[in-house]
Amino acid sequence: MVKQKDYTIDSDLYSKIEIYLKNKDIKFIEKAYNFAREAHDGQLRLSGEDFFEHPKQTAIFLADLKLDSSTIAAALLHDVVEDCDCDSQDIERIFGLDVSRLVDGVTKLSRNDVIGDSEFSPTTNFYDEDIPEDIAQAETLRKMLMAMADDVRVVLIKLADRLHNMRTISFLPLNRRLAMSRETIEIYAPLAHRLGIWEIKWLLEDLSF
């Protein structure tokens, strides 16, 4: 059996995926892991940690749910199109159509977030624009439900993405934290409930108060 030392991949992620995935699938995830790590090289979050820690933690949580290799790879890559010098054609060419579609789906959903992943960057100017008092809940929820109908894995990645962002929300200004918490309670926790993923639902609710 191939051991963790034979992979250039985080031990926390490896320890979860080696339980249920074949070696070829782990190699595929390793490829996405290294691609995303290099793409995000030099980028930081407000916490001071490497930006890559965010997609890595997103992937680790989905590995807890024992999702397929394409989903784990897409979780690792979910910010590269929006935040790096990379486009969806690059993702499709290197990782295939399935992963590319998942990344595109998450990218489209993220554009509806009141607080996006990019706002966790220390270069963000929080005073460029005000947050609207009324979050467009119905429109955002409609798009997420449409994504569920197309491929539920897109929403699962987005839920894991939101979970890690909520765990690091303390580094945002108060107005951003309040807006993001409200959006999480009104949109993301109910979606987790709808999917029957109780652990994510409870965690999101706890982190929103």
Kindly label every feature range from the protein language model.
Residues M1-F209:
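Active-site helical microenvironments for divalent-metal-assisted chemistry
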